[in-house]
Amino acid sequence: MRLSLESLEILDAIARRGSFAAAAEEVHRVPSAVTYMVRKLEDDMGVPIFDRSGHRAQLTAAGVELLNEGRHLLRAANELECRIKRIATGWETELAIVVDTIIPVTLLWPLLKQFDALNSGTRVRLLHESLGGSWEALLERRADIAVGAIAQGPSGGGYSTHALGEFRSVFVVAPDHPLANAAEPLSAQVLMQHRAVVVPDSARQMPTYSYNILSGQDILRVPSMADKVAAQVAGLGCGYLPLPWAKPYLDSGALVIKAVSEVRPQSRLCHAWRSQDAGQALKWWVETLTSTDAIQHWLATGDLE
């Protein structure tokens, strides 16, 4: 057998993350090991999977076909492994939880400690996505639960949800940013002249969400909400932040709120999970997440305690 599930997992990670280095981080390997596995796969199969003639390696037609069919095999293998363990014990081999970047993953640490105390043998894997990326991970069965997903879920069903409520976003800049002393409310014409810091939608296949980005505006894209906060505190751009993220920096004076002409409406979040073939681990996490108010408390106050 020239194909292995490990090589298909690496190929999938490269395609989703956009680079060998990012894929290596996801699969917990050094980049050179990922490069070696890809070249070995190409040698074993006798076909090029990546075209390396340009600035960035791109999948060949054969590589695209291998990726698409390989994803079917990965899903089937994962479902088989989980089914076998559920039949034997009722507990999944692994449970994947995707956490939207708007939610500090540290809020899950107390729940993970409770889950560890069960000694179920189920491995927990945490993923980080933004906006539609959380839904995509759920619908592609790369994740079993989505924590803090945007409430406007895609059509098609196959999942259940639990509302987390709304949170407020505020438009903020650093005190030394040019907009800090600009007349309020800030108009779209004024904002157009300044760079926005954004966490882009991480969905690769689904239609993406975009909030409050003006057509033609300069954009600094960062990988997480924590990076967005840091960039705006550093004065590298402007933009909306969820109030829970902004609050400590507003209290310290590291950020200031500016009124804008077009006020952003409050956003709604939810937990979502696959509603079919639920094992004991998924049931435990759903029951625990929907009965605890730690995330709702943070959304309301910004308090991580």
Residue ranges and their predicted role:
Residues 55, 85-104, 117-122, 167:
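Interdomain hinge and pocket-entrance segments immediately C-terminal to HTH DNA-binding domains
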Residues 13-30:
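Short helix-boundary/capping micro-motifs
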Residues 42-61:
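A short LG(V/I)-centered, amphipathic sequence patch enriched
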Residues 157-236, 241-266, 287-305:
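C-terminal regulatory
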